[in-house]
């Protein structure tokens, strides 16, 4: 599939080495946000045979990292909590309710008073967690359910311990299980579609040998999950991400609006880019199946940039 889209799948580009057991993996979903049809889906690298049959796009649940800032914190804050992109939060030392400090990804200390727009553009952890704390994790969780996520945990007991995703770490994608690229992409497609969520579709209809329709999947299954004005504001802020923020590597055109959000989990176990143009929404996950961190060694094969490079290469090809 990658080769058909004009993207090389070789070890020189993406650091795969046949001498290593652990190999970096990737998954991608592309959807036409206007109707929900999935136009491309990649579940992993290489020919899908033997041990390569796992479809990571639909079956692998991974931490969404900072891609959840927009969905869990900022979307509900703008949509129903009376906040705007100009609402400010202080990027200063801040602890979760349990006392653990919230850490920013950047190592240059804190950046003081910043609006939500800047919090999105620069992917500021403390700003996102503070926003979710104000609007409450319960509201953020409810919005995520409305965005179509099915792998979230409301409350679950495991070996005598209680697990729940209704907490402050939700803002940074800190989940009990994780999400699939398939569902994450559908949520971002809702923003691209001016707040209307379309249940993603992998087929239009199924017919028998005589042409009789057995399954009809052409009827839209859609709902308004955020206001059009909220979608417009989020899109505007995420355009800044691509123009001058954490997603500049994804920019492939100066004539077409491109919006999106980067995402990394702790220790770079999961690296994402979810974004859209006026035509398609695409989400890319990269990481290792055994959950080791992606390499942060700079150079031609800088692994933590692969998700953005794949996104740009494929989206440029299809536009």
Where on the chain are the PLM-derived regions?
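A generic secondary-structure signal for well-formed alpha-helical elements
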Residues: 80-84, 96, 135, 139, ...
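Active-site SXXK
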Residues: 35-36, 62-89, 119, 187-191, ...
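Mid-domain, small-residue-enriched loop/turn segments at the edges of structured enzyme/sensor domains
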Residues: 100-105, 136-185
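Secondary-structure capping and boundary motifs in well-ordered enzyme cores
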Residues: 20, 27-31, 35, 60-66, ...
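Conserved catalytic neighborhood of penicillin-recognizing serine enzymes
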Residues: 82-140, 167, 209-240
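Active-site-adjacent bridging/hinge elements
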Residues: 38-52, 144-164, 283-287
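A penicillin-recognizing enzyme superfamily signal
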Residues: 1-20, 24-32, 40-42, 47-60, ...
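Short active-site loop at a secondary-structure junction
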Residues: 24-26, 49-71, 86-89, 169, ...
């Amino acid at each position: 599939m990658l080769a058909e889209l004009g993207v090389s799948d070789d070890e020189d580009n993406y650091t795969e080495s046949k001498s290593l057991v652990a190999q970096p993996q990737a998954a991608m979903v592309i959807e036409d946000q206007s109707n929900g049809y999935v136009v491309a889906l990649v579940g992993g690298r290489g020919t899908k045979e033997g041990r390569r049959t796992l479809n990571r796009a639909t079956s692998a649940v991974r931490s969404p990292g900072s891609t959840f800032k927009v969905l869990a914190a900022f979307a509900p804050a703008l949509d129903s909590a009376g906040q705007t992109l100009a609402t400010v939060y202080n990027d200063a030392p801040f602890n979760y309710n349990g006392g653990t400090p919230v850490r920013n990804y950047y190592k240059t200390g804190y950046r003081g008073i910043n609006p939500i727009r800047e919090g999105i553009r620069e992917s500021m952890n403390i700003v996102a967690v503070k926003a979710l704390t104000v609007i409450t994790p319960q509201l953020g969780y409810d919005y995520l359910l409305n965005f179509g996520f099915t792998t979230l945990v409301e409350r679950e007991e495991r070996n005598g311990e209680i697990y729940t995703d209704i907490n402050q770490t939700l803002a940074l994608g800190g989940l009990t299980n994780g999400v699939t690229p398939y569902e994450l992409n559908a949520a971002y497609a809702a923003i691209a579609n001016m707040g209307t969520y379309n249940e993603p579709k992998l087929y239009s209809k199924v017919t028998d040998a005589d042409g009789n329709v057995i399954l009809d999947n052409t009827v839209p299954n859609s709902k308004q999950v955020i206001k059009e004005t909220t979608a417009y504001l989020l899109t505007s802020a995420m355009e800044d991400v691509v123009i001058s923020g954490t997603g500049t590597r994804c920019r492939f055109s100066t004539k077409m609006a491109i919006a999106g959000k980067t995402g990394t989990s702790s220790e770079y176990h999961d690296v994402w880019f979810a974004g859209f143009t006026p035509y398609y929404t695409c989400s890319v996950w990269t990481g290792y199946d055994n959950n080791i961190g992606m390499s942060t060694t700079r150079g031609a094969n800088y692994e933590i940039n692969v998700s953005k490079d794949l996104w740009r290469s494929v989206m440029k090809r299809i536009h």
